[in-house]
Curated annotation (Swiss-Prot):
NCBIfam families: glmU (TIGR01173), PRK14354.1 (NF010934). Gene3D superfamilies: Hexapeptide repeat proteins (2.160.10.10), Spore Coat Polysaccharide Biosynthesis Protein SpsA, Chain A (3.90.550.10). This is Bifunctional protein GlmU. Its EC number is 2.7.7.23, 2.3.1.157. Residues 230-250 are annotated as: Linker.
Amino acid sequence: MYNCAILLAAGEGKRMKSATPKVLHKVCGKEMVNHVIDALREANIEDVNVIVGKKAKEVQLKTESRSVSFSFQEQQLGTGHAVKCAKEFLLGKEGNVAIFTGDAPLITSKTIKTLMEYHETNGFHGTILTSIIDNPSGYGRVLRENNGEVDKIIEHKDCLKEELKIKEINAGMYCFNIQALLEALDKLDNNNAQGEYYLTDVIEILKKDGKKVGALAVNFEETMGVNSRLQLAEVEAIMRKRINAMHLENGVTIIDPNNTYIDCNVVIHNDSIIYPGNILQGKTVIKENCVLYPNSRIVDSIIEKSVVIQNSVILQSNIGENTTVGPFAYIRPDSNIGSAVRIGDFVEIKKSTIGNNTKVSHLTYIGDAEVGERCNFGCGTVVVNYDGKEKHKTIVGDDVFIGCNANLVSPVEVKDNSYIAAGSTITDEVPRGALAIARSKQINKEDWVKKKDEK
């Protein structure tokens, strides 16, 4: 059976109080609307149409890479009107259409599959996704017939006293037979106080036409929508719990899951240990046997096997196996750190390559540089890469020893097996095997202090 989907993503989200369209707010590193699209795709629904409205271009820009189509809702005239705007998408199709909202990122592919199968197996023309909650106040109630099929949906304000006791609510997600939906949409009107077209009225139309309507009850958290920053935080907490549980099941030790923040696209291999306060974002990959001590942030980076990181920031970079980083190191984008390297405290690396077995132990800046293997950077070494207009490159060969408080003024090359004396400012090439000394000769003025005090 052919299945397609319509995704409602045209709402303004005024309660978010944000210039960003509501559906583009991120949950664990991914836009809410893209969470739903990805769940639909995992449920084998490839043909997805996204309804966009105000700030349509922003939503299109963030979703078009997922090969979806778009329909436009220029005026916000209700959920039924939004689906009416997608009629062109539905015309000529036979099968079923799932309708979901772009602000409900917790929906899973498993639930979507179950909904579609339940709808088709029972021969329903429409199926509502519902939840049963202890406090249904404010939600539309689902009334069922004796055979379990849906009789109608009643909004909270229209419920009678007995109907208010019903705890099954409409989750605002549906599956329809496409032809039955198109026929119902043609009969949909806006004869109500708000002058809007409601998708819930389609259920009433189907029932009047003698069509079968079913309901599938699922866990409430999967259907949670986001209309405020508070709800966004609640949804993020649930998603984070899911993500951390997945990593725990896959053999990762997370010392305190409630205080560990891992984006949905992060990959962590088994036998790694994550301490509290770590933030892993983007497409970061943590290989086997790594230890992330508390309070590091790693973004879009690849961390190879057996790396130890403490209290550091790593952005868009690669860290080789058996390397240690931190505490308080800053690895900036486009850096490649080799294997068995030591990047110590208060070290900043920017757009540089550091060779295997090199040690940069403390208080050092390396920018726009190529550093070879088995080098040692003394405390306070600075690569002076910026002349006020342009960045320049520094090349340091293999087996180079740089003393404390040295400056390498770019562009400059320090060749293999050479030494730089402490306190030197290097502006010219250092030959292979040479000792470079670039500092003033020490002068001791005898009795200088006594003479100063006598003045």
